[in-house]
Design a protein with these regions (language model features):
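A shared catalytic/ligand-binding motif for oxyanion handling
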Residues: 1-170
C-alpha cells in the first residue's frame, strides 16, 4: 500500500501586541490568507481575560500562555480542517512558551512556541529546552521569536555565529 505524501503548513509571527482592534483584524485576515493548518504567534500582550480576542473564524482551537500583565504571551491556533487531539499542554506563568503534545492528522507531534526575552535570550531558550526535554521527541517543531540569530541569514552583520548558538541548532 502506497502512503500518500502529505504536508503540514505552520506559520509563525511575532505580533508585538494585539490590544488594538485594527491589529487583531489585520492578523485575522493574514491568518486566513495564508491557508495554513497551524498558526503560532508570539507577544500577544493579552491577559487571560482577553484571550477571547484571539478568535478567528475557522480556527476554534486556541491554546495560549499568558500572564497577568499585558506583556509577552504566546499562542498556538489550530485550523478546524486539522484533526488535532491534545495529550499534554505545558505553559509557563510568564507567557513565554507553550508546549503542545498530541496528534495532528493522526501523527504524534510536539509543538513548542517560544518568545524569549531580549535579555539573556540564548540562556533562556536553552533553559526552556532543558525544562521540556522529557516532552520533546523526534517529531518536535520549535518555533517562535528566540531573539537570537540561529544562522548567518538571520544576522544583519557579517559577524559569525558563536559556538553556543551553533550547538543550539543541533
Amino acid at each position: 500500500m502506497t502512503r500518500m505524501c502529505q504536508y503540514l503548513s505552520i506559520i509563525t509571527l511575532n505580533v508585538n501586541g494585539l490590544n488594538s482592534p485594527i491589529k487583531r483584524n489585520r492578523l485575522t485576515e493574514w491568518i486566513k490568507k495564508q491557508n495554513s493548518a497551524i498558526c503560532c504567534i508570539q507577544k500577544t500582550h493579552l491577559t487571560q481575560k482577553e484571550i477571547h480576542r484571539l478568535k478567528v473564524k475557522g480556527w476554534k482551537t486556541v491554546l495560549h500562555a499568558t500572564r497577568t500583565q499585558k506583556k509577552s504571551g504566546v499562542a498556538i491556533l489550530f485550523a478546524d480542517k486539522v484533526d488535532f487531539k491534545p495529550k499534554l499542554i505545558k505553559r509557563d506563568k510568564d507567557g513565554h512558551y507553550i508546549l503542545v503534545k498530541g496528534t495532528v492528522q493522526e501523527e504524534e507531534m510536539t509543538i513548542l512556541n517560544i518568545y524569549a526575552p531580549n535579555m539573556n535570550a540564548l540562556n533562556y531558550t536553552k533553559q526552556i529546552l532543558m525544562d521540556t526535554k522529557n516532552q520533546i521527541s523526534t517529531n518536535t517543531i520549535v518555533v517562535g521569536d528566540l531573539n537570537t540569530p540561529l544562522s548567518q541569514i538571520d544576522r544583519s552583520t557579517r559577524k559569525k555565529i558563536n559556538n553556543e548558538i551553533l550547538e543550539l541548532n543541533q
